[in-house]
Amino acid sequence: MKHLLLVVMGLLYTATAFPFGVYIFADMEGCTGVTNSEQISGGFGAARMEEDINACVAACFEAGATRVVVRDGHSSGRNVNPAHIDPRAELIQGQTPGVRYQHLDGCEAIILLGYHAMSLTPNAILAHSYSSRNTQAMYINGREVGEIGIDALIATEHGVPVVLVIGADDACREAEDWIPGVVTCQTKKSITTQSGKCLSAKRSHARIARKTKEAVAKRHSIPMIQPVYPSTLRTELVPKGSVRVVFPEYVRDPNPRIREKTGNNVEALLIGKPRK
């Protein structure tokens, strides 16, 4: 009995002596049950986003985190109702110009929740790269990239690894391709750009919780992907609103407008001046 008490006290000491935070960057398209454009423009998608966030937040704390920051990262950044989010979490809403991961200090792991595949991925649910209105494709040093790859590179620039990516099957494959060793959590399987086969909410949230705990436990062993500098970010732009979808796939415009930026900071190439 005395030995057991000492073990428990030791575990409690370890949890409190080495506090750490987890940063959850939440998008909507990859969340549980979201399969089409109509669902992300109203309350349905926001409610599903809240539920996935809460499953992830609770698991972070159960895994030993002493702080969890949630960034509402879909569109305007004003999607979830703060009253519906686990009160233990810190919630960031609204636009944060020039900074992808606001208030990352003290966090040892980043989770990309509700993410989707890059634009032009065949038959991938709601696939796009930052803008579904006018961005046809993006490349970093010649390699086609989406939000998962770029956000992982920016995370490296801040010294924090992406440990978990949560989304549809194609987003999970993309994450594994970009971040060797990353934990992935599949919430659904894409059928077309506007349809998918989903897990029940109960099963999906249980999977999110299990995968979150696994990823947080592995946070020191998942390597950060290393940017190659100078980096060139190439973006293929088409007229606003003309990213074409011929059901069930996206169709590439053969004559896009090209924008290129080169520099030694991926975050600055994407959104402007990086955090000092």
Regions found by a protein language model. Give the residues of each.
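A glycine-rich helix N-cap at a beta->alpha junction
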Residues: D86-H103
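Active-site rim beta-loop-alpha module in soluble metabolic enzymes
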Residues: I154-V162, I166-K211
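C-terminal accessory domains and tails appended to enzymatic cores
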Residues: S204-K276
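Active-site glycine-rich loop that binds ribose-phosphate moieties when present
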Residues: S132-H158, G167
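Boundary at the C-terminal end of the N-terminal hydrophobic targeting segment
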Residues: A17-P19
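N-terminal signal peptide c-region/cleavage motif recognized by signal peptidases
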Residues: L12-A15
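Short catalytic helix/loop segments, enriched in acidic residues and glycine
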Residues: I40-C56
